[in-house]
Design a protein with these regions (language model features):
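Short S/T/G/P-rich N-terminal loop/turn motif that feeds into the first structured element of a domain
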Residues: 1-68, 72-99
């Protein structure tokens, strides 16, 4: 079942670029779409995944090992995971994924 969410993070485009560099170019299994844009307080993301399990595997095995050291370096601590607002997806129409 498609899993999508949005959340805000208090980082700038420079920190985001460091995170993306650390993740490397390989597309995460199950990722349908990822959007990030600037807000007044940092960045906002929208992610769409094939399933919640795909997202959780990526977060635990790939994202957190990259993000946590960067946040520790920049902030002196690792803040709690931001609150995710889960989206009630009706359709995900992309060039790679029929809903």
């Amino acid at each position: 079942m498609t899993y999508a969410y949005t959340y805000d993070v208090p980082i700038d485009a420079g920190i985001y670029a460091r995170i993306k560099d650390g993740l490397g170019p390989e597309r995460p299994p199950g990722l349908i779409a990822h959007l990030a844009w600037s807000t007044e307080s940092g960045l906002r993301y929208v992610d769409v995944w094939r399933s919640k399990d795909d997202h959780e595997a990526f977060a635990e095995n790939r994202l957190h090992p990259v993000v946590h050291p960067i946040l520790q370096e920049m902030l002196g601590f690792v803040p709690p995971e931001p609150t995710h607002t889960v989206l009630d997806v009706i359709d995900a129409w992309t060039d790679r994924h029929p809903a």
